[in-house]
Regions:
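Long, low-complexity or tandemly repetitive, helically biased scaffold regions used
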Residues: 1-105
Length: 105
């Protein structure tokens, strides 16, 4: 398996875990509204994972994706995971706005 494919798959796994962390952070914030240090960290984790997936997907050769199932699937899962991480980060932004919180670095 090509290095670029392995990197894309690894980035997708990281992004999926970041998205799960964001869900857990939102659940925690429902119980403990002052726990924004966790929410803030989950937001930035999702954004970093999203960028990593997008970058890894961009390194894959689109022409090779037409003929190689490994490359095609790696691009698909990296793109999907990037979108999920983005969606979960956006959910945290919505919650922050609802609770009048500014997400911090």
């Amino acid at each position: 398996m090509k290095l670029e494919v392995r990197k894309a798959r690894a980035a997708a796994i990281a992004a999926n875990l970041a998205a799960q962390a964001a869900v857990a952070a939102r659940e925690l914030l429902e119980e403990e509204p002052s726990a924004w240090e966790v929410g803030d960290a989950a937001y930035w984790l999702c954004r970093a994972a999203q960028k990593a997936c997008e970058s890894a997907a961009d390194t894959l050769d689109p022409e090779e994706a037409e003929t190689s199932a490994d490359v095609f699937v790696a691009h698909l899962i990296a793109s999907s995971a990037a979108q999920e991480a983005c969606d979960q980060a956006d959910e945290l932004v919505s919650l922050a706005e609802e609770l009048n919180h500014e997400i911090r670095r």
